[in-house]
Each structure stands twice: as C-alpha cells, then as structure tokens.
A protein has these predicted regions:
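Copper-binding active sites and cupredoxin-like electron-transfer domains
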Residues: 1-221
Length: 221
C-alpha cells in the first residue's frame, strides 16, 4: 500500500522456484500494509502473507519517540483451506503479531513477553490492521493516545484520542505516554476480538529493559 504501481503488470502469481523483483519510490511517509496480491487474496492474507512498511518523513516534525513498537492485528481462521469461513467472517481468534494473547500474561499465564517503557517516555506504536475482515477500535486501557497520525502521515495528526478506528488494510501511528508506573492494556475495543486474543500489555516501570522498543525489539518476538 506504500507504492503506486500497475495492478496488471506488477501484480500476479509467483510460481514455485520463481523470483520477481520490482522497485518503487515511496512518495508518502507513514505506516503501510503490504500483502500477497495473488488470487485468492483473502486466503493468502488469512494465512499470514502480509507485513508492514514504515516510511520515515524526510524532515520529521513529530516529537522524538523514546521507544517504538510494531503491532499487527489479524484474524485466525482454524482451517486455512476453508475459504467460505473467511467469506462468512467465522474466525476463532484475533491476534497481535500472529499470537493469541502473545503479550498478555494476564489472559495467558504462559506469555513471557510484553511491551516495556519507563514512566514519562513517549512510546510510538506502528499499527497495521491486516484483517482480512475485522475493523479495529484501537484503544489503550488506562491511557489516552497522546497523538495519532492517520496512515502514519505526520500531516494527519490528531491529539488526545481515547480510541481510533483502523479498518482492514489500513494503518496508523500512535503515541502513548504514561505519567506513572503501572500497566496499560492495548486492545481493540471490539471486545469479542480483544477477549479472543487481541490484547497487548505495556508495562511502565523505572527498570524497563533498555533494549525493548529499539532495534530488532520494535517487533517483540
């Protein structure tokens, strides 16, 4: 979604053992969804053939982030061959970064990772809703989004948002600051989706791991 291409010549099937390559100029800054464009597209997205492209502004006027994280929301369809279930929106779970309660030790006692920051730090979240069907009402429980940028473009700024809706195939950038120690739970406020897996806990503590939210740890594995 970050590129301006030709849907006929630049999209198509890649056969086993085949490689295709193209380049493009990123004309707009922001956070962008990318995904498999071959038919059946919905099934390929439901199988996880997607990701995020972050295009930083040339002259960044936004406040500097102290930590950065990537969260991608998607739905889990138990049978990857059941295309009708995808058409009927019959998912079993909604996930962040490919895991059910992946960063939520409250709902999954086996979870060993969560997001970390220190009180007062500006935490920037690059968020993509991969879908393929559900909207996300992206919300930080016990917090307020200090700033939100629609599609991640710095010209599309909103301030003091309790939640913000991101449709399937869309993205946004969110800044969160906690003035005190404690936890926020980042969720989609579509609660059926949240309570089946789309919750990520961010712990604000004075002894937060300095590596978290930097380098390879912007995508917590």
């Amino acid at each position: 979604h970050a590129a301006r291409l030709d849907v006929v010549t630049d999209f198509g099937t890649i056969n086993p053992g085949e490689t295709k390559k193209f380049t493009f100029t990123a004309d707009y800054p922001g956070a962008f969804f990318y995904h498999c464009g071959a038919d059946p597209m919905m099934q390929h997205i439901a199988r996880g053939m997607f990701g995020i492209i972050i295009v930083d502004p040339k002259n960044d006027t936004r406040p500097k982030a102290d930590r950065e994280y990537v969260l991608i929301q998607s739905e889990l369809y138990p049978n990857p061959e059941d295309r009708q279930a995808m058409m009927d929106n019959k998912w079993s779970n909604v996930m962040f970064n490919g895991g059910v309660f992946k960063y939520d030790p409250v709902h999954d006692t086996n979870a060993t990772k969560w997001l970390q920051a220190k009180p007062g730090e500006r935490v920037r979240i690059y968020f993509v809703n991969a879908g393929p069907n559900e909207f996300s009402s992206f919300h930080p429980i016990a917090g307020i989004w200090d700033k939100v940028w629609l599609s991640g473009n710095p010209k599309n700024e909103m301030v003091g948002m309790q939640s913000f809706t991101v449709g399937p195939g869309d993205a946004a950038i969110f800044d969160l600051i906690s003035p005190k120690e404690g936890a926020n739970a980042i969720v989609t406020h579509s609660l059926r989706a949240a309570l089946t897996g789309a919750i990520a806990v961010i712990m604000f503590t004075k002894d937060a791991d300095p590596a978290m939210g930097h380098g390879e740890q912007i995508l917590v594995r």
